[in-house]
């Protein structure tokens, strides 16, 4: 096999692992004539009545033989202005070459994208979650409108992965996701070449305004945090969702761990051609792979790794695309029985580059399967079960310090907690690793915009020893709109050394890079008159991550008085894409989807 030869010429254990993981996809012996694999594209390539369609395809360079081949849509979330995405066009070309070698016809197309890291802390972040829906809509539109028989999608940044998987669930034709890969760690010359990443850049501002670092050090950090292409390196949203996709069986083994620009990633791209051909032959579709058991596996992996709160929104939305209902209670049930064992950023020390060196996500899955935490019987895009795929991988490296044994976890239960109570009757999602404690009671400081909080922090209005619950509201699906991520405020709190003194609560979201005492996705949101809209400065708020409660300690009589005089503010946008989004988006607890009939 060509891709195995490519890997064999590379040095090192990682390349050998990749060769082992990708073997078994050789399908050149399959006779496409024996089994019709172009059952969708034949709608336009077959009938004489579709002569105009065929004329346009000939114009693209197809010949008579090509017209009989299955057509594969190769979707890339490529754009130049983001390290997570800037290399994806090249990966798409490599996938197309693999598709061609497998005897199929590949057509590349693109989606839009929004960089969370670049838009963070600005109104541009309102477009981030919405981009998930546009990505899903665009891939679905091209696949259905062009009658492609199969799909390979290549995502990079946070919302790309769920957008691709939602689309695959909707059109339900043989599909594979090829993750763009993680960035390598940066190093700060001003700090003895200490490893740094994008969250280091975010936290540098809080460190600077509190005098912990000087301006040359701050600039050094932001200059060296991101050394090249690839998604943010910690167990943030991109790596969380790529790992979830692999756990569900929608990627080739190892995809979520292979670094951007690595020989393993290039080999995976070529192998996708043979793999998609096998899926066509066996007629294995996304809804055959993304079963309830597969989603359970993804939730378990997320809890063990300390993954992003965004996984809750995204997995609920992906499940909906394949006709499965996931709820907040499903996540809490998994969290109750799943230990948190990964010492990975943002709450820990290591990044995906380090995890890859000890075996990557396949070795983690192999360990969890051996311990009975995940179901290995689920079918995957290899045509084999998850357990069969994992046999080709080594156990976690002996003596490694990144993944703890289940007998000695960082936390005996998962870090994601679903909290309900008088402040969040329909639920909220907390990211609590235990380092910041399990309970928090403090007085509310209420802000209707995140930059108002940043200004208050700059003025020194928050002190150590004063327990404060900062509320940033009107940032929900409709009110934001788009549930902007609060990485700028959470990073500023941690950078200022206030992680144990200030809890942050919002109807918006948190980046996968956030850490601290954080509660997001508060439902109902402020825009629709949820209790969070009625909170006033000085109100006492009690957070209990053991009992999973979130309560506003204000009596019902006073709440009724506040409710009687409250009026909903107008939507922030009166035209354009965000108005359409605000009018159609569901609640956070339902995944913030825009194609619901409810």
From Swiss-Prot:
The Gene Ontology CC terms held by the record are: mitochondrial matrix; mitochondrion
What are the recorded GO MF terms, alphabetically? 2 iron, 2 sulfur cluster binding; dihydroxy-acid dehydratase activity; metal ion binding
Q: What is this protein called?
A: Dihydroxy-acid dehydratase, mitochondrial
Lineage of producing organism: Eukaryota, Fungi, Dikarya, Ascomycota, Taphrinomycotina
The entry's free-text remark on the cofactor is: Binds 1 [2Fe-2S] cluster per subunit.
Q: What is its EC number?
A: 4.2.1.9
Which locations, inside or outside the cell, does it occupy?
Answer: Mitochondrion
Q: Which family does it belong to?
A: Belongs to the IlvD/Edd family.
């Amino acid at each position: 096999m060509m891709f195995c030869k490519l890997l064999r010429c590379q040095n090192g254990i990682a390349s050998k692992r990749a060769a082992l993981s990708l073997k078994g996809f050789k399908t050149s012996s399959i006779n496409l004539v024996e089994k019709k694999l172009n059952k969708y594209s034949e709608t336009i390539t077959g009938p004489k009545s579709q002569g105009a369609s065929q004329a346009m395809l000939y114009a693209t360079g197809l010949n008579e033989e090509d017209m009989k081949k299955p057509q594969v849509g190769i979707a890339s979330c490529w754009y130049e202005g983001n390290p997570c995405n800037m290399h994806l066009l090249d990966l798409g070309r490599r996938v197309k070459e693999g598709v061609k070698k497998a005897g199929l016809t590949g057509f590349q197309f693109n989606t839009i994208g929004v960089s969370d890291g670049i838009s963070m802390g600005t109104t541009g972040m309102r477009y981030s979650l919405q981009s998930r829906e546009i990505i899903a809509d665009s891939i679905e539109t091209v696949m259905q409108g062009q009658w492609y028989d199969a799909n390979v999608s290549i995502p990079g940044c946070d919302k790309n992965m769920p957008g691709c998987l939602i689309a695959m669930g909707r059109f339900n034709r043989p599909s594979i996701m090829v993750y763009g890969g993680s960035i390598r760690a940066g190093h700060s010359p001003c700090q003895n070449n200490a490893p740094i990443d994008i969250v280091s850049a975010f936290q540098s501002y809080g460190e600077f305004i509190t005098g912990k670092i000087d301006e040359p050090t701050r600039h050094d950090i932001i200059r060296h945090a991101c050394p090249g292409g690839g998604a943010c390196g910690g167990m943030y949203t991109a790596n969380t969702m790529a790992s979830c996709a692999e756990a569900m069986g929608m990627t080739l083994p190892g995809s979520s761990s292979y670094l951007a620009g690595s020989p393993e990633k290039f080999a995976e791209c070529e192998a996708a051609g043979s793999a998609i051909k096998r899926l066509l032959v066996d007629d294995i579709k996304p809804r055959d792979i993304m079963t309830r058991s597969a989603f359970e596996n993804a939730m378990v992996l997320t809890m063990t790794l300390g993954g992003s709160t965004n996984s809750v929104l995204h997995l609920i939305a992906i499940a909906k695309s394949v006709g499965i209902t996931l709820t907040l209670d499903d996540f809490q049930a998994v969290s109750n029985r799943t230990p948190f064992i990964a010492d990975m950023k943002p709450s820990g020390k290591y990044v995906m580059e380090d995890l890859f060196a000890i075996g990557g996500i396949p070795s983690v899955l192999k360990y969890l399967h051996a311990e009975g935490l995940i179901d290995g019987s689920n079918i995957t895009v290899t045509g084999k079960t998850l357990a069969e795929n994992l046999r080709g991988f080594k156990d976690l490296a002996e003596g490694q310090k990144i993944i703890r044994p289940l007998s000695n976890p960082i936390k005996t239960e998962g870090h994601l907690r679903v909290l309900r109570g008088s402040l969040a009757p329909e639920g909220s999602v907390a990211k609590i690793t235990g380092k910041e404690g399990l309970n928090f009671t403090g007085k509310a400081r209420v802000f209707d915009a995140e930059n108002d909080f940043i200004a208050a922090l700059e003025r020194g209005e928050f002190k150590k020893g004063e327990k404060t619950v900062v509320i940033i509201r009107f940032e929900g699906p409709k009110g934001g709109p788009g549930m902007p991520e609060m990485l700028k405020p959470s990073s500023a709190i941690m950078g200022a050394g206030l992680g144990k003194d200030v809890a942050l609560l919002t109807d918006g979201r948190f980046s996968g890079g956030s850490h601290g005492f954080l509660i997001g996705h508060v439902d109902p949101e402020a825009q629709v008159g949820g209790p969070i809209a009625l909170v006033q400065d000085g109100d006492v708020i009690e957070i209990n991550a053991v009992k999973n409660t979130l309560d506003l300690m204000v009596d019902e009589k006073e709440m009724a008085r506040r409710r009687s005089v409250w009026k909903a503010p107008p939507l922030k946008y009166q035209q354009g894409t965000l108005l359409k989004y605000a009018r159609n988006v569901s609640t956070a607890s339902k995944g913030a989807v825009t194609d619901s009939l409810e």
